[in-house]
Amino acid sequence: MATGDLKRSLRKLEQVLRSLNYPNEVDYVGLMKGDTAASLPIISYSLTSYSPHVAELLMESNIELIAKNDVRFTDTVYKLLRDQFDYKPILTKKQFIQSGFAEWKIEIVCDILNCVMKKHKKLIGLDKNSSCQRKKSISEKPEPCSSREKCPAEAVGIDVTGRFMTSGKKKAVVIRHLYTEENVGVPEGTVTSTEVSEGCDELEEQSSDIRIPEAQAPEVKAELQDMCDNPELTALQIALAECQEKLKKLTWIEKRLECLEATTKGKVMVDEKAWNNILSRVTLLETEMLLSKKNESVEPNTTSEDSESVSGVDVVPYDKKYSVEGPASTCHSSGYSTVSSATVPRSSTINYCGLNNFSEETTMQKMERMKKMFEETAELLKCSSR
C-alpha cells in the first residue's frame, strides 16, 4: 500500500470530521496501522450523538449500539448500513475486525459518515414538510370553541386566513379592508390582523418543535385540560403513583424476608452475650470434668496407700507383743502393756474412715454442682430457641 494513498484518505477523513463537528481526539496512529479500536468511536458518535433524527430512527428500528463489544457492534453496524442506508462495505466483518486494511477501513468510515449526514438532511426535510402540512391543515380548519370554555363576548375579528381572533388582551382587532388607506382612524392600542397572524405563526413554529404524534395530539390536549381543570384529581393520581411505588418496595421486602427465612430455616439464633456465656460455662464444665477424672484416678491410689499404712500399723504392735512378752508381764501392775498395744491400731483405723467420708462428700458436691450447671445451660438454650 502506498503511503500517499493513506495520507490522502486521512485528509479526506479530517475534512469529513470537521463537517461532522467531531469533538473527541482521533487516533491517527491506530488508523494508519489498521486498528479497529481507532475507527469504532467515530462510527458510534456519528450514529448515536451527531443527529437526533438518526438516533430516533435507530430507536424506532430497535437497534442498540451502546454497551456492546467490538464484534457485536460491527455486526449491528453492518446490518444497519444494509437495511437503513443501502450501503455495502468493501471489507467483510472479519476483515474489518482484523488488524490491517488501513486504507479500506478509512474509506469505509468516510462513507459511513457521509451516509449519516445525507440521512440527517433527508430527515430534516421530511420534518419541515410535515410541519408545513400541519400549518396548512390548521389554517384551513377553524378552531371551534369547546363546551367547557365560554367564548368571551368581546370584539371578534376574522383574519384573511379564516381564523377566529378574540380580544384576549384588551386590544381591539381591526379587520384588514381592501382599500389602501394608510392607518385611517386606527387608535393607538389596536393591533392589525396581520400582526396577530404573524404571532400565531410564531407560536405554531414553537409548538411544532414539541413533537407529538398526530393521532395522540387530541388525547394529550384533553389530558392537559383535565389536569388544569381538576387539580384534586391530579393530586390523587400523584398519591396513587407514590402508593404503587411503596407497594413495589413492600413486595421486594417480602421477597427478601422469604429468602432470609429459607436460608435460616432449621437454625437457632442466639444472642452474642448468651452465646459467650454458654461457651464459658461449657469450658468450665469441661475443666471440672477433667479435674474430677484426675481426682477419681488419684483416690484409688490414696486408698491403696492408706490400706498399706493401716496394715503396717496393725502388724507392728502384734510383733511387739510377741517379741516383748517377758517385760510385759513385769509391767502388769501399771496396766500399760495390753491397753497401749490395743489402742494404737484403733485410732489409726478411725482416722482412715474419716478421710474416706470426707472424699465421698466432696465428690457428691462436685456432682451436684455439675448437675446445676447442666440444668442452667439447658434453660439458656431453651430461652434462646424461643
Swiss-Prot record:
The chain residues annotated with the modification Phosphoserine are: 329
Q: Where is this region: Binds with microtubules and centrioles?
A: 11-194
Q: Which GO terms describe its molecular function?
A: microtubule binding
BP-aspect Gene Ontology terms = centriole replication; centriole-centriole cohesion; centrosome cycle
**Chief localization:** cytoplasm
Task: Tell me the superkingdom of the source.
Answer: Eukaryota
According to the UniProt entry, the coiled-coil residues are 232-262, 359-382
Query: What is the official name of this protein in its record?
Result: Centrosomal protein of 44 kDa
Organism taxonomic ancestry: Eukaryota, Metazoa, Chordata, Craniata, Vertebrata
